[in-house]
Regions:
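Short, Lys/Arg-enriched N-terminal segments with co-localized hydrophobic residues
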Residues: 1-26
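Positively charged, low-complexity terminal tracts
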Residues: 18-108, 112-119
Length: 119
């Protein structure tokens, strides 16, 4: 059911338009269609700020920067980050996995580690 699918999304498996064909809204036929932006009843719940495509092809990896709506504060929370992997099958992209970067501090540690390995 649509309600069960929305609950599954909210449980941490991800907000993405790729699920919305169930609701008759979008298909993810191109990389540009992939997003973490999510609205409910006209209210933006997840506001995508930016995305960087890390790899393209049958398997696509995207880094998203976003904010989540905090109804108790009536504003968006701090910037958050997620890396998602998509597989293109049957003409559309489907999310296969994700890694949530839990804080700006964790993001800095990832950047520092990669920088030290690459340089």
């Amino acid at each position: 059911s649509v309600t069960a699918e929305k609950d599954r999304l909210r449980s941490g498996l991800g907000y993405a338009r790729l699920i919305l064909p169930i609701w008759g809204a979008f298909l993810n036929e191109t990389i540009d269609d992939l997003t973490v932006q999510f609205e409910e009843n006209g209210q933006v719940i997840v506001n995508e700020l930016d995305k960087v495509v890390l790899s393209k092809g049958a398997w696509t990896t995207i880094l998203f920067r976003y904010q989540q709506w905090q109804p108790e504060k009536d504003c968006f929370g701090p910037d958050m980050y997620v890396i998602r992997r998509y597989k293109k099958a049957g003409g559309e992209y489907r999310q296969q996995s994700k890694f949530n970067i839990s804080s700006a501090d964790q993001a800095r540690k990832i950047v520092d580690a990669l920088s030290s390995w690459i340089n």
